[in-house]
């Protein structure tokens, strides 16, 4: 289980409707998360942004 410092977030692709779920430390990462990950629908790496 995640502790109270961490929050489960959704990462949404900037180019398609693909999504990832991950955990973020709220104390260390106060801004919105932005990662480059593999998009399974487009079959290439794109930027995924944190969505609420």
Swiss-Prot record:
Biological process terms in GO annotation: translation
A GO term from the CC aspect: cytosolic large ribosomal subunit
Pfam families: Ribosomal_L33 (PF00471)
Keywords in alphabetical order: Ribonucleoprotein, Ribosomal protein
Gene Ontology MF term list: structural constituent of ribosome
Stretches of the chain forming a coiled coil according to its record: none
NCBIfam families xref list: PRK00595.1 (NF001860), rpmG_bact (TIGR01023)
Alphabetized HAMAP family for the sequence: Ribosomal_bL33
Family of this protein: Belongs to the bacterial ribosomal protein bL33 family.
Name the UniProt record assigns to this protein: Large ribosomal subunit protein bL33
Lineage, highest ranks first: Bacteria, Pseudomonadati, Chlamydiota, Chlamydiia, Chlamydiales
Gene name of the record: rpmG
């Amino acid at each position: 289980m995640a502790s109270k410092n961490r929050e489960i977030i959704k990462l949404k692709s900037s180019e398609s409707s693909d999504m990832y779920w991950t955990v973020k430390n709220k104390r260390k990462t106060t801004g919105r998360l932005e990662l480059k990950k593999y998009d399974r629908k487009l079959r290439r790496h794109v930027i995924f942004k944190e969505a609420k």
